[in-house]
């Protein structure tokens, strides 16, 4: 019967002894550089009075490592410093128990980084939280731009309006699509963006979802892509971008039709095991955070479906395209047939030569079991 009273007393004691964000940072030597920087850039009050927040506090080690990398927040552009610190604050409280309840599923969360400070999203920039699968002491990983994972080294430090988690490395601001592709090893898609002169167009968009084909998928279409002009390639790129929609994987539910940048449509559906399909391609990596939205990595290029009964393969992918792309490919049909015919002749000739050689490779030269090549 005394437990409720004890709980109330504990709650009151907690509130009576709660401290401000600045007071908590001041009591820990590992946050001395962070506290100085927050005062220098006038962020203490702004971060302090955001209710129900989670703040990923960079330790002295994190700030020194960032300076060694070339970004000294004491002397850097104040806007860069403000962006990094505001990106480290989430708009809700996420404790260790909250994150562990995700069961290794990543959760997209909103940060305090609002447009147009190093991001181009109407609702502000996002980060991702997941449970630490390595069984770390604190069990929290925060994912930021470029897919960088940062582990929490000390968790659940309370302050007046939320909770602090200490990190020994900085969170990375999400980059634009070209830098994300370049640094993420998405070489073929980056080449396609540059060849089609689509970089500026995509990077000017706010609230965009981009589906990035894996290198292997684009390599299969390379013979066709090589025959297209820059304008035609631009149309292909546009079919991989959905404007005015920031579609994190948690928002995909059931079947939905999306309109792409060039006005064609994509069909999104959830599989029985929770997998996500875009037309015939499967999403193999979700929620790559971008400066202007989000990207998903897929295992096939998106030439929107024209006939669901088409078989798989290069020409099926082409036939699945929009009428504009199909007309482009049809205009080159004689060239394609010639290339395929030459390839077939070459394969048959090599097979004939190989068979002939295998029949005449050796013959007996004496009666002692010795052989010689023909």
Swiss-Prot record:
Presence of the UniProt keyword Transmembrane in the record: yes
Keywords assigned by UniProt, alphabetized: Glycoprotein, Membrane, Repeat, Signal, Transmembrane, Transmembrane helix
Example GO biological process: macroautophagy
Chief place where the protein resides: membrane
Null mutant phenotype: Abolishes the production of cercosporin.
Membrane topology term: Single-pass membrane protein
Glycosylation sites: 52, 72, 120, 132, 176
Residue ranges of domain FAS1 in the record: 19-171, 173-302
Pathway membership, UniProt: Mycotoxin biosynthesis
Family, per entry: Belongs to the fasciclin-like AGP family.
Function comment: Fasciclin-like arabinogalactan protein; part of the gene cluster that mediates the biosynthesis of cercosporin, a light-activated, non-host-selective toxin. The perylenequinone chromophore of cercosporin absorbs light energy to attain an electronically-activated triplet state and produces active oxygen species such as the hydroxyl radical, superoxide, hydrogen peroxide or singlet oxygen upon reaction with oxygen molecules. These reactive oxygen species cause damage to various cellular components including lipids, proteins and nucleic acids.
Identification of the protein by name: Fasciclin-like arabinogalactan protein CTB11
Lineage, opening ranks: Eukaryota, Fungi, Dikarya, Ascomycota, Pezizomycotina
Gene designation per UniProt: CTB11
């Amino acid at each position: 019967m005394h437990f409720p009273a004890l709980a109330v007393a504990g709650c009151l004691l907690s509130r009576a002894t709660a401290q401000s964000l600045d007071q908590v940072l001041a009591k820990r030597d590992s946050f001395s550089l962070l506290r100085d920087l927050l005062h220098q850039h006038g962020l203490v009050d702004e971060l302090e009075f955001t209710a129900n927040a989670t703040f990923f506090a960079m330790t002295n080690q994190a700030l020194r490592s960032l300076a060694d990398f070339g970004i000294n927040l004491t002397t850097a552009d104040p806007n860069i410093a403000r962006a990094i610190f505001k990106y480290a604050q989430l708009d809700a409280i996420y404790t260790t128990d909250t994150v562990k309840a995700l069961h290794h599923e990543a959760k997209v969360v909103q940060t305090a980084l609002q447009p147009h400070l190093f991001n181009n999203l109407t609702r502000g920039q996002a980060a991702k939280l997941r449970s630490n699968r390595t069984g770390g002491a604190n069990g929290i990983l925060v994912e930021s731009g470029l897919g960088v994972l940062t582990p929490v080294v000390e968790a659940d430090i309370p302050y007046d309006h939320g909770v602090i988690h200490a990190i020994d490395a900085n969170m990375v601001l999400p980059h634009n699509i070209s830098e994300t592709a370049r640094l993420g090893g998405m070489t073929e898609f980056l080449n396609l963006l540059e060849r089609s002169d689509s970089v500026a167009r995509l990077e000017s968009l706010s609230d965009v979802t981009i589906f990035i084909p894996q290198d292997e998928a684009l390599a299969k279409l390379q013979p066709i892509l090589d025959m297209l002009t820059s304008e035609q390639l631009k149309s292909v790129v546009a079919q991989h971008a959905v404007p005015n929609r920031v579609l994190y994987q948690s928002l995909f539910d059931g079947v939905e039709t999306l309109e792409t940048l060039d006005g064609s449509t994509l069909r999104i559906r959830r599989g029985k095991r929770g997998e996500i399909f875009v037309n015939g391609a499967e999403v193999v990596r979700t929620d790559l955070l971008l400066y202007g939205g989000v990207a998903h990595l897929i295992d096939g290029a998106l030439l929107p479906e024209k006939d669901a009964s088409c078989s798989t393969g290069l020409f099926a992918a082409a036939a699945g395209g929009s009428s504009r792309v199909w007309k482009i490919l049809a205009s080159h049909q004689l060239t394609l047939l010639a290339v395929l015919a030459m390839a077939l002749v070459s394969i048959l000739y090599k097979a004939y030569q190989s068979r002939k050689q295998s029949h005449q490779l050796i013959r007996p030269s004496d009666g002692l079991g010795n052989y010689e090549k023909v």
